[in-house]
Swiss-Prot record:
Family annotation (Pfam families): THF_DHG_CYH, THF_DHG_CYH_C
Protein's name according to its UniProt entry: Bifunctional protein FolD
HAMAP family, per the entry: THF_DHG_CYH (MF_01576)
Pathways involved: One-carbon metabolism; tetrahydrofolate interconversion
Domain of life: Bacteria
Length: 299
């Protein structure tokens, strides 16, 4: 049965619309959305993520700038760079690639980004707007925003009468995911690795979002029949069959077994990951429109 949600396909559909809206902005208002990505140090995984973000931004017709600074960069210097980007009218979105070196206060850095340009949705102003259900005015974190679009594709935008369980309580995924589901009228439970009888809690879910960071933690017998299962987990594990030192990605869900029971399920990779980058493009486009007091494109 074809119950696998194709994140790549849905993401490309979104990117097509972003490109069209970008052309409108340029033709009608002479505005080119601009995104600046800051990367501290030379972490290989971060380099790969940033390269994919820059490539997608350029594909969308955005101005895309990458600032690579050494891992010895001091917090004060990083704050100065952010202040410069905050005041640059050509830049509408600022993203600081995480993780940061231990000597830099991550929270201080993320909160230094102007909330209007905070395309990650981490600033307290955007967090508060999401919590207050001011979704039209908030910048929503990319991963939960993408996951929500996948859920809407199967369940519609009104989730009244459906029980949703979010396994994971991070500020980046779990909490904003729960807020989005609540705003869509689902009855929401936030669970985590220390939740008592977690398997029973998961079995109550019509919609299950796994974002706990534990490989294949969610088993087939934890899933209600015909549930929608969104796997946000990205776990890199050894794959010796591919060669010495090789790895592969798996999610928080035991995909091969759970897919036999779920009505719809996202794979890892190829599920939520492509949607996260697509929603970063959406957030940047919307930020550009908002900063110029123009109508906000709908997605």
């Amino acid at each position: 049965m074809n119950n696998i949600i194709d994140g790549k396909k849905l993401a490309e559909e979104i990117i097509v619309k972003v490109k069209a809206e970008t052309i409108k902005l340029r033709n009608n208002y002479n505005i080119q959305p601009g995104i600046a990505v800051i990367i501290v140090g030379d972490d290989p995984a971060s380099q790969v993520y940033v390269a994919s973000k820059n490539k997608k931004a350029e594909e969308c017709g955005f101005l895309s700038i990458k600032h690579v600074v050494s891992k010895e960069t001091q917090e004060k210097e990083l704050l100065q760079l952010i202040a410069t980007l905050n005041s640059d009218p050509k830049i509408h979105g600022i993203l600081v690639q995480l993780p940061l070196p231990a000597h830099i206060n991550t929270n201080r850095i993320t909160q230094a980004v102007a909330f209007q340009k905070d395309v990650d949705g981490f600033h307290y102003v955007n967090v508060g707007k999401l919590a207050a259900n001011a979704l039209e005015d908030a910048i929503i974190p990319c991963t939960p925003a993408g996951a929500m679009m996948m859920i809407e594709q199967h369940c519609g935008r009104d989730l009244s009468g459906l029980d949703a369980v979010v396994v994971g309580r991070s500020n980046i995924v779990g909490k904003p995911m729960a807020a989005l589901l609540t705003a869509a009228n689902a009855t929401v439970t936030i669970a985590h690795s220390r939740t008592r009888d977690l398997d029973d809690v998961c079995r109550s879910a019509d919609i299950l979002v796994a974002a706990v960071g534990r490989p294949q933690m969610i088993k087939k017998d934890w899933i209600k029949k015909d549930a929608i299962v969104i796997d946000v987990g990205i776990n890199r594990i050894p794959a010796p069959e591919k060669g010495v030192g090789k790895t592969h990605l798996i999610g928080d869900v035991d995909f091969e077994n759970v897919k036999e029971k779920a009505a719809a399920i996202t794979p890892v990779p190829g599920g939520v990951g492509p949607m996260t980058i697509a929603m970063l493009m959406v957030n940047t486009l919307k930020a550009a429109a908002r900063l110029h007091n123009l109508p906000i494109p709908k997605f």
